[in-house]
Regions:
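Conserved, mostly hydrophobic/aromatic
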Residues: 6, 18, 42, 50, ...
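Active-site mouth loops of central-metabolism enzymes
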Residues: 21-33, 77-87, 110, 136, ...
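Short, acidic/polar
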Residues: 28-42, 84-100, 116-117, 140-149, ...
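Acidic-and-aromatic substrate-binding clefts and catalytic sites of carbohydrate-active enzymes
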Residues: 26-30, 53-61, 81-88, 109-116, ...
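Acidic (Asp/Glu)-rich catalytic clusters
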Residues: 7-12, 44, 63-73, 92-101, ...
Length: 247
């Protein structure tokens, strides 16, 4: 698995990680066992970065269970997502618990109360509980504010959507990330599945085989990662075998 530096501090990440939105919001032993199998497959292929959030229901808890016994092999990314200071502390406490005591990449989710949240994340970084701070947003209407945060010098990376149907980041976010040396984590590489609805035929994919591409999902991941300004992509899946294919 190729690895790239996420931001100016040179923290290395795999070019393909895994998101947990929706797919890891599960309960019950059978569903949790499936999630563990998916995580183990990702670790075995080197796709050892897992992105979550308190916003994703049970995902942080389920991910933590799945990493039991292999936490040292993983890079955990999560977020804080609230305008309430007390709730933010409870979220952070729960996230650290589920992540076995530390979180490598901690993000302000959708820029909610970002000045105060960055203050707290910087404290956690100083305490050695996190490595790199980031910020996320899914909506192009918020990218101007995201760019303000990028220029603040307080974050090392951003997480934004990027796929053939969502290309707003090309206009200003990616150029600014390149200028500032910030990492870029790609959410929604498959457009929440919309880009996958029309699968090309094997004949159409054949020209991509020399590049290691045999599926449409692989082609979409390569599409985003072929831009050197993009550091990694985090597809989500609820199906065993998919992470092996994606990696």
């Amino acid at each position: 698995m190729e690895r790239r530096a996420l931001g100016p501090d040179g923290f290395e990440v795999p070019v393909v990680g895994m998101g947990t939105s929706r797919t890891f919001d599960v309960r019950g032993r059978a569903a949790e066992a499936t999630s563990r199998r998916i995580v183990e497959e990702a670790l075995d292929t080197g796709a050892n970065l897992f992105d979550s959030s308190p916003m994703y229901g049970e995902a942080e808890r389920v991910l933590g269970l799945a990493l039991d016994g292999r936490r040292a092999e993983a890079i955990v990314a999560t977020k804080v997502w609230t305008a309430d200071d007390d709730l933010a502390e409870r979220q952070i406490e729960a996230s650290l618990h589920h992540a076995h005591g530390r979180v490598e990449l901690y993000q302000v989710h959708n820029l909610v109360a970002w000045p105060a949240r960055l203050d707290r994340l910087e404290q956690l970084r100083d305490e050695g509980l996190i490595d790199v701070i980031g910020a996320t947003h899914y909506d192009a209407a918020a990218f101007a504010e995201l760019m303000t945060v990028m220029r603040s010098g307080r974050i090392g990376f951003v997480q934004v959507p990027y796929n053939p149907l969502e290309r707003d980041v090309e206009r200003a976010v990616l150029p600014l990330a390149e200028e500032l040396g910030l990492g870029v984590m790609l959410m929604r590489p498959f457009g929440r599945g919309s880009v996958l609805r029309r699968w090309p035929s094997p004949t159409e994919l054949a020209p991509l085989e020399p590049f290691g591409v045999t599926t449409w999902a692989q082609a979409l991941l390569k599409w985003g990662l072929s831009d050197p300004r993009c550091t990694l992509s985090i597809p989500a899946t609820s199906r065993p075998g998919r992470m092996t294919e994606n990696a």
